[in-house]
């Protein structure tokens, strides 16, 4: 659930706060 989850969360752009440490991005946080 790395790329698939990332794409899904990125699409929503609101629930990307659980994998910011794993990806080092935090799209939802920004």
Swiss-Prot record:
Disulphide bridges, residue numbers = none
One BP annotation, GO: negative regulation of blood coagulation
Keyword line: Metalloenzyme inhibitor, Metalloprotease inhibitor, Protease inhibitor, Serine protease inhibitor
Q: Which domain of life does this protein belong to?
A: Eukaryota
InterPro entries, sorted? Kunitz_inhibitor_STI-like_sf
User: Which family does the record assign?
Assistant: Belongs to the protease inhibitor I3 (leguminous Kunitz-type inhibitor) family.
Question: Could you tell me what this protein does?
Answer: Potent inhibitor of serine proteases plasma kallikrein, plasmin and coagulation factor XIIa. Weak inhibitor of serine proteases trypsin and coagulation factor Xa. Does not inhibit the serine proteases chymotrypsin, elastase or thrombin. Inhibits kinin release from HMW-kininogen by kallikrein in vitro.
Name-wise, this protein is Proteinase inhibitor CeKI
Which species does this protein come from? Answer: Paubrasilia echinata
């Amino acid at each position: 659930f790395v790329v698939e989850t990332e794409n899904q969360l990125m699409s929503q752009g609101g629930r990307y706060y659980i994998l910011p440490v794993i990806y080092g991005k935090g799209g939802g946080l920004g």
